[in-house]
A protein has these predicted regions:
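Extended hydrophobic/aromatic segments used for targeting, binding, or gating
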Residues: 87-90, 161-185
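Active-site nucleophile/metal-coordination loop of metallo-enzymes that catalyze phosphate/sulfate
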Residues: 1-16
Length: 187
């Protein structure tokens, strides 16, 4: 919320827990109970002619409020962002938490081309972010890319590209999993 409004974090009162608790994120629309009303930065940039792109975690407001949707916040493109603050899975072998049985809010959406490929969610989101830049660059448009990796939020699941070197360095499995996730973001 602080990033989206320009306010100091402690001044927003944001707690993002449940809609009936005060305060739960921001709202781009006035009059929404228990939210911080403000015009979000992406909306201001969009209004100024920027092509606005969101990729990854979009945890600005509680489910069911206007601020829960990146589109309502002023983004033209949204890649896998919803109200969830964490993914159900970082692993493509687990379809990033998507199952055929039922919908799950924590399942990362719109990443089917990576299912079963062995690509960690962090890398998949990075690849998608790069793809979204093709349009504004090709058309000479100014752009704003808000890249918000889910890592290193729980569940702590290894980025297989990097974990072995941490195990070889003597880290326990938990530390190695976490370190591999950090390196995946830094890559």
């Amino acid at each position: 919320v602080a990033m989206e409004t320009g306010q100091i974090e402690e001044n927003t009162g944001d707690r993002l827990i449940r809609p009936e608790w005060n305060i739960n994120g921001m709202s781009p629309a006035p009059g929404v109970a228990h939210t911080q009303y403000a015009t979000p930065l992406p909306q201001l940039l969009k209004d100024a002619g920027y092509f606005t792109i969101h990729v990854g975690k979009a945890h600005w407001a509680s489910a069911g409020t206007p601020g829960a949707s990146p589109y309502n916040m002023g983004f033209v493109v949204n890649v896998s962002g919803n109200v969830a603050g964490m993914p159900r899975s970082y692993q493509s072998e687990e379809n990033y938490g998507n199952t055929p049985e039922k919908w799950n809010m924590l399942a990362v959406q719109n990443m089917t081309e990576y299912y079963g490929t062995g690509v960690h969610l962090t890398e998949a989101l990075t690849r998608e972010a790069l793809k979204t830049l093709e349009y504004p660059i090709r058309h000479g448009e100014p752009f704003f890319l808000y890249m918000a990796h889910y890592a290193t939020h729980t569940p702590i699941q290894p980025d297989k590209r990097f974990i072995q070197k941490y195990l070889d360095a003597g880290m326990d499995k938990g530390q190695a999993r976490y370190a591999s996730m950090v390196e995946g973001v830094d890559k």
